[in-house]
Each structure stands twice: as structure tokens, then as C-alpha cells.
A protein has these predicted regions:
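Post-His helix in hydrolase/transferase enzymes
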Residues: 286-298
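Catalytic histidine-centered segment of alpha/beta-hydrolase-like enzymes
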Residues: 277-289
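Conserved hydrolase catalytic core segment
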Residues: 128-164
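Hydrophobic, aromatic-rich cap/lid helix
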Residues: 29, 209-234
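Active-site loop/oxyanion-hole signature of alpha/beta-hydrolase fold enzymes
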Residues: 80-133, 137, 294
Length: 304
């Protein structure tokens, strides 16, 4: 059973053009979009219709959404991007920093703002208005990108971790595990303690083809956790966001942070609709993909 509250509609029409490189799969197109700082972001597209961009969560890459693409493709030109440092996207820029001893070292220049700019850059590369679906931390980036470009006509946010919590202690423990060669344990620790994904959901994730990539890329998660711990939710800003938004949540999601974030968005966004997937947690798209895709499609198509 799905609980619904009601909402609105409205679109901003803008146009742009982009060219893609065709892959061996004639239904799939892969391109690279340069973000504001020059980082190349990989995007894979399929289908026909208005553009729908999917922004994945904290671990994994665009392949995480491949099972859902055929469900969206009849209705949209659906594009799944690799966030910086994930999949085929570049990690991001480094800058030379001179110390007090005049020693020059290379330093990572990562920031959440650059993730916002990445999403906005991909959106701006697409023709016409763009729908954006963001899962978990990808939802934070999708939301903030809507303040950087007017081309986002609708948002779908699935449990973005927006609340002001410091998780650097978790990041420290994960870093020690990685240094000890316990990469998979570091990933499981993240999944259990931050989004509080259930053991059953983690077991299901381990069976997915994307799991080895999640383990291999767990280092990137450290910088994201540290940066997200500095993020501050601004309800006043959210009240000014004039973009129709579908908020998605699972009734069995255990994380108080994720629950509070959805409630905060419900209370502040002027044009929002909430759908709660009964019996589901943080990864409903894995267990009920058809229902998930139908819910998103109906909202984006104006049927709700």
C-alpha cells in the first residue's frame, strides 16, 4: 500500500543540445560531460522521450540503476550518471599547495558544492527540461543542483541524508579498516551505521553485480562522509524552491536521520508530494522495481 499526499505541477522549458558516442549496445549511449572544474562525468542514456537523470547514492555507480532503466526507457530518455570518483567519471581536481616550508604538495579539492555542480552540468547538457531522481546522498546533490540550474522541472528525492549530524567518527573507523585491508567490512559498516540498511538489504546488495565495485571504491565514501558532516540544511532556502518534488521513503527505514530529512523537506518545500513504500527500507527499487518505476513515472508524467 502506498500513502500519498497531494501536489501540483509546473515546468520550465529550456533547450540545449548534446552529442553522444554510440556503444555496442544500440539502446545505450555513453557520453562525458565536463563539470565546472573540468572533471569529466560519465553519463549513460537509453530510451526516448523527456530527459530523466538518475543520481546514484553513496557507493556504487551508474550500473546500480541498470535493472530499472528498461522500466523507464519507454517513457523517458533516461540517463544514469557516475558521480565524481565513481565508475567511469574522473575523481576530481587536485591543486598544488605550498606549505610554510615552501614544500609543494598535491591536495584533494573535493567539496559537496562540486557534486552539486556536476549534476547541474549534466542537466544543462541535456535538451529541454530535465527530471532528476536522486537516491540517498545523490538526493542531496539533486536537490542542491536545482538551485544552480533552471532546467530541472521536477525532482524525485529518495531519503536524502540532509540533517546536521557529524559522522566523522564513523569515517575514522572505516579508514582504519581500509588501512587494515578490511575493505568490505568498511563498506558494511557504512551501510549499517549511516543509512542503517537492514541485514537482508545488505545481503541483497552483495548479490548485485555492482557489489565488487562498491568494495573497490569505498575510499571515495570517506571524503563524502566527512564533507556531508559539514552540510547544513536551510529550511528558509527550501521554502523558496519552486520545483515540484516527489519525496520517497520506506516505512521500514531505520535511520532517524533519513526519516527526519524527509519530514523536514515535507514541511518546507512548497510543491511536494510524499509516497511511502510500505514494508520497504532504503532500497525499494531493488525489491519492488516495477512499483517503484510506476510511482516515479506517474509523478513525472503528471498522473498524480
Amino acid at each position: 500500500m502506498i500513502k500519498r499526499s497531494a501536489l501540483i505541477l509546473s515546468c520550465v522549458l529550456v533547450s540545449a543540445t548534446v552529442s553522444f558516442a554510440q556503444t555496442a549496445d544500440t539502446l545505450s549511449q555513453v557520453s562525458f560531460v565536463k563539470s565546472k572544474d573540468g572533471t569529466r562525468i560519465a553519463v549513460e542514456c537509453t530510451g526516448k522521450g523527456p530527459s530523466l537523470l538518475i543520481v546514484h547514492g553513496g557507493t556504487g555507480d551508474r550500473s546500480r540503476w541498470k535493472p530499472l532503466l528498461p522500466l523507464f526507457a519507454p517513457h523517458f530518455t533516461v540517463c544514469a550518471m557516475d558521480r565524481r570518483g565513481h565508475g567511469d567519471s574522473e575523481t576530481g581536481g587536485r591543486s598544488e599547495v605550498r606549505s610554510q616550508r615552501s614544500e609543494v604538495r598535491s591536495e584533494e579539492t573535493y567539496s559537496l558544492k562540486k557534486e552539486f555542480e556536476d549534476v547541474a552540468a549534466v542537466v544543462n547538457s541535456r535538451p529541454g527540461p530535465v527530471f532528476v531522481l536522486g537516491h540517498s546522498i545523490g538526493g542531496v546533490f539533486a536537490l542542491e543542483a536545482a538551485f544552480l540550474t533552471k532546467k530541472i522541472s521536477k525532482l524525485v528525492l529518495y531519503e536524502p541524508p540532509l540533517q546536521d549530524l557529524d559522522h566523522t567518527a564513523v569515517a575514522d573507523r572505516m579508514e582504519r579498516m581500509i588501512q587494515a585491508g578490511e575493505r568490505e567490512q568498511a563498506l558494511v559498516t557504512f551501510l549499517r551505521e549511516l543509512p542503517m540498511i537492514s541485514p537482508d538489504e545488505i545481503a541483497a546488495m552483495k548479490r548485485q553485480p555492482s557489489w565488487p565495485g562498491r568494495v573497490a571504491g569505498i575510499d571515495i565514501q570517506i571524503r563524502e562522509i566527512r564533507s556531508l558532516s559539514k552540510y547544513r540544511f536551510d529550511g528558509k532556502r527550501m521554502k523558496a524552491l519552486d520545483v515540484p518534488t516527489l519525496l520517497l521513503a520506506g516505512s521500514k527505514t531505520a535511520s532517524p536521520q533519513l526519516k527526519q530529512a524527509i519530514n523536514s523537506l515535507k514541511d518546507t518545500l512548497p510543491k511536494r508530494m510524499l509516497v511511502v513504500f510500505e514494508g520497504q527500507g532504503h532500497n525499494a527499487m531493488d525489491k519492488i522495481p516495477a512499483q517503484f518505476a510506476e510511482t516515479v513515472t506517474k509523478f513525472l508524467s503528471g498522473e498524480q
